[in-house]
Design a protein with these regions (language model features):
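Short edge-strand/loop segments of extracellular domains
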Residues: 137-139, 187-192, 248-249
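A short hydrophobic beta-strand segment most commonly corresponding to one strand
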Residues: 168-171, 240-249
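Histidine-centered catalytic micro-motifs
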Residues: 144-151, 230-233, 247
């Protein structure tokens, strides 16, 4: 099962507009830092009633997971962390959780019949959801996600196959280019657990993985990526705003 594709214009403009409006409101009500109870205007921050934090903030243009044991240590290398072009003291929203409970438009998107039909065609009618996360890469400050494979649980399974860890949809709310979009190394979902450090060293660039390709998109496009595929994204030094609603099956 080779999944590294893009469906163009799946999400129609009225749906994109609704998602943009609700997302902008949430970002305006985000806490000023992880664990803070107030937003940048001094109001009570959104989402304090939920068991899981809605927002995860990072330093501008940083790589918060690379080279750490966070998320089961699946990001073994570190991306470059360029200095912001202007002095930015505040942390920035990087991840948002719980799209189904934070936005009515997010709940509708999760049940989009075309996307659920794609999920059934890949996994069969007995598929189940497992997670969602919205990646926010604001222009000139958005953080990076170092090279990784999403799967962590089934690498040694006696029933291992190329699709055992499932796949992710990413719904794009804005146009993205090479500096802001997701990058994927085609075919790596077939290789099992990859020695990511070694593979990066085999290339000629300290940050760009050999054979990686950009999944540049327009607003309303949906990418479909096997969770075993090697992928990552760079610090967003571009003028693009990238908001990618990510959910998998």
């Amino acid at each position: 099962m080779c999944i590294r594709d893009r469906f163009e214009g799946v999400i129609e403009q009225p749906e994109v507009d609704s998602l943009r409006v609700e997302m902008a409101d949430l970002l305006d009500r985000a806490p000023v830092d992880n664990g803070s109870t107030v937003d940048k205007k001094g109001r009570p921050a959104f989402g304090q009633e939920f068991a899981r934090p809605t927002f995860y903030l990072v330093e501008p243009l940083s790589d918060p997971w690379g080279g750490t044991e966070i998320l089961n240590g699946r990001h073994p290398t570190k991306m470059n962390e360029p200095a912001p072009s202007s002095r930015v003291n505040e942390k920035v929203v990087f991840i948002m959780n719980g799209m189904c409970q934070t936005m009515p438009s997010g709940l509708r998107l999760y049940g989009h019949p075309d996307l659920l039909g794609i999920a059934a065609s890949i996994n069969g009618d007995d598929y189940v959801p497992y997670n969602d996360a919205t990646f926010v890469k604001q222009p000139g400050v958005g953080g990076s996600v170092s090279w990784h494979q999403d799967g962590v649980t089934h690498w040694k399974s006696p029933d291992w196959d190329q699709g055992i860890h499932g796949f992710n949809f990413q719904v794009q709310l804005y146009d993205t280019g090479a500096r802001s979009c997701l990058w994927v190394v085609p075919g790596t979902h077939k290789l099992g657990k990859i020695d990511i450090k070694r593979r990066l060293l085999e290339g000629s660039d300290s940050e760009l993985m050999p054979d990686a390709v950009p999944l540049a998109c327009n607003a309303g496009d949906v990418t479909v990526v096997n969770r075993q595929a090697l992928h990552g994204s760079f610090a967003n030094t571009s003028n693009d705003l990238r908001i990618s609603l990510t959910f998998g099956f």
